[in-house]
Amino acid sequence: MPKIIDHDQRRRDIVEVAKSIILKGGFEAATMRSIAAEAGFANGALKHYFPGKESIVAATFETVLHEHDTWLQESISEGATPERMLQQVLQGTLPSGVAEIASGRVLLALWEYAMSNDALTVLYRTHLGRWHAMLVERMEAARDAGSIRDQDYAALANEFISVAVGATVINLMYPDGERIADYENYIDQFLARLR
């Protein structure tokens, strides 16, 4: 009986290997040869799943953005008050653990590549747009519940996104989460300013 191969799982495994190599050695370390060796493939066998490094990088970029979206959705408790949901969204967008920090570090390593790839630029801008809309929506819901004051929520969402991106950059130098308490304090201060 022929062996059944889950090709989608193999692609996911290859992306995980690429992420691991990028974390250890940066973008340049993730060559087709290094990815194949780490994944246990012959160099040419990767081409069955990805035609080249560009397609692996694109899949890795998409995977990291999907991870961030998933963590954000999972941070929200059903039935929470609008203010608590806002707090959860804020907490879900700032790095809160080693896995989120590692994922952010991979994303940053891929930014330079994404700048010259129109499809990835659009993908990231779309991600930022969803994130911004979610923050504004959560602030408006908290306002409607009487928990926070009416303010320029679009500007506040932009500020928060900038801080979250900055936290991701800072984590390049603090990969073990030494700054997580600072981010939690910032969320408390941000919420206090909204009240």
Predicted regions and their residues:
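N-terminal intrinsically disordered/low-complexity leader segments
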Residues: 1-9
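Amphipathic, non-transmembrane alpha-helical scaffold segments
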Residues: 11, 15, 61, 65, ...
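Helix-turn-helix
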Residues: 13, 17-59
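Solvent-exposed, amphipathic alpha-helical segments
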Residues: 13, 17-25, 71-75, 106, ...
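Short coil/turn segments at alpha/beta junctions that flank glycine-rich nucleotide-binding fingerprints
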Residues: 24-28, 79, 100, 145
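Hydrophobic alpha-helical connector segments
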Residues: 59-62, 70-103, 154-160, 184
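Amphipathic alpha-helical segments used for helix-helix packing
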Residues: 98-122
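Hydrophobic/aromatic-rich alpha-helical bundle segments in the mid-to-C-terminal region
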Residues: 101, 119-125, 129, 143-190, ...
